[in-house]
């Protein structure tokens, strides 16, 4: 039996000291700043927590409106609700599947506090245009880059463009087994106010300099601190993030070159000057081309061994293609939570007394989002990333062409 460390024996933790300290989070934060060029970064427990921290930092609260998209994972709007504010949905661009900046402009009201675009599937939203729009109206852009941590716009890393950007480590392109995320900003005031949303008072007291922030340091954050085990893994992922992303881009470009001429399938669009991180490889299916539904085509793909899902339509409720969704899917404005407008009871936050113009969410509001949700299909990780290469991509192409060659068998 080992001698107690108290009396000169070896420490039980030994080299695992980092698992109980904060230095790994600090190293990750420094690495993120170096990687993106942003001045400040704070690791948190998830991408949702990063978004919620950013919204809190921007002063978003009861009665405020935040423009976002319904064509996304539910957490994008969930972070708005967590701050007791109201999501106002803008439609998407039919090519990039990201926020339509002109529709966002049309949705701005005196109650608009922020714009929350989503870099969906890894393609950046039109952040430069949205930043100009925000400047015109004195509002803040909180970018949801949870699926696009290694993307770029005109050579500038995502995380160094919007007023504040949220990252997530729960999936590609940077992954940590225990999850986690971070918010990044070049604005010291936003950085410090964001700490109040979920950091321990001792953390706030050690980082903040603003007397107003320090005054509220003991307000009782929600404990949105990142697990040090996740931080340890994320640091390693960050070291070769660009190399892995570039390999994934090569794989996806190979797919595009091979399937772009197949009738009925539209391969992903990449806006000039934008670097797509390819969290998913998302195509559009034309059901009229063959008289076969998108869901039937996806069933055939999965049967061939290619994992494919209709993300917006049902990924919030199922990830196994053979399982049944809990309820009808689709863009968020069609989901029960938004149609009923009673998340916290008594109509809050949608119908609370602070809301001047309670939103009504209904079918037909977002025609592009609604159409794309019925046509998209996504090829997922890990099929797109190293060690997969062109040989593996060709297997996916072979599966698709096999289905197209036998498409009449799928007609019902």
Task: Please give the residue ranges for each predicted region.
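PLP-dependent enzyme catalytic core of the Aspartate aminotransferase-like
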Residues: 339-412
């Amino acid at each position: 039996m080992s001698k107690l460390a108290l009396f000169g024996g070896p420490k039980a933790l030994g080299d695992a000291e980092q698992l109980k300290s904060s230095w790994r989070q600090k190293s990750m934060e420094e690495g993120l700043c170096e990687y993106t060029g942003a001045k400040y970064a704070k690791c948190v427990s998830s991408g949702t927590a990063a978004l919620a921290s950013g919204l809190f930092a921007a002063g978003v609260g009861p009665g405020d409106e935040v423009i976002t998209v319904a064509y996304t994972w539910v957490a994008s709007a969930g972070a708005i609700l967590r701050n007791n504010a109201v999501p106002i949905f803008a439609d998407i661009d039919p090519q990039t599947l990201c926020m339509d900046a002109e529709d966002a402009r049309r949705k701005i009201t005196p109650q608009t506090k922020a714009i929350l675009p989503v870099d969906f599937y890894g393609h950046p939203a039109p952040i430069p245009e949205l930043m100009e729009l925000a400047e015109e109206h004195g509002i803040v852009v909180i970018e949801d880059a949870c699926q696009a941590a290694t993307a770029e716009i005109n050579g500038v890393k995502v995380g160094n463009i919007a007023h504040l950007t949220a990252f997530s480590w729960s999936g590609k392109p940077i992954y940590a087994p225990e999850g986690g995320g971070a918010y990044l900003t070049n604005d010291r005031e936003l950085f410090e106010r964001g700490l109040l949303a979920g950091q321990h008072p001792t953390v706030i007291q050690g980082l903040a300099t603003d007397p107003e922030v320090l005054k509220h340091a003991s307000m009782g954050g929600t404990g949105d601190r990142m697990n040090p085990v996740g931080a340890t893994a994320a640091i390693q992922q960050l070291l070769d993030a660009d190399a892995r992303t570039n390999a994934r881009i090569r794989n996806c470009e190979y797919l595009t070159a091979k399937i772009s001429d197949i009738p009925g399938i539209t391969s992903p669009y990449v806006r000039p000057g934008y670097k797509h991180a390819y969290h998913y490889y998302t195509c559009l299916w034309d059901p009229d081309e063959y008289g076969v539904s998108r869901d039937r085509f996806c069933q055939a793909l999965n049967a061939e061994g290619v994992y494919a899902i209709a993300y917006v339509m049902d990924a919030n409720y199922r990830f196994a293609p053979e399982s049944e969704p809990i309820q009808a899917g689709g863009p968020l404005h069609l989901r029960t939570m938004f149609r009923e407008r009673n998340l916290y009871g008594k109509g809050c936050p949608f119908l609370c007394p602070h809301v001047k113009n309670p939103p009504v969410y209904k079918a037909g509001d977002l025609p592009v989002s609604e159409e794309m949700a019925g046509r998209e299909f996504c090829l997922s990780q890990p099929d797109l990333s190293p060690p997969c290469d062109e040989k593996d991509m060709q297997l996916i192409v072979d599966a698709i062409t096999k289905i197209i060659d036998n498409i009449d068998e799928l007609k019902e």
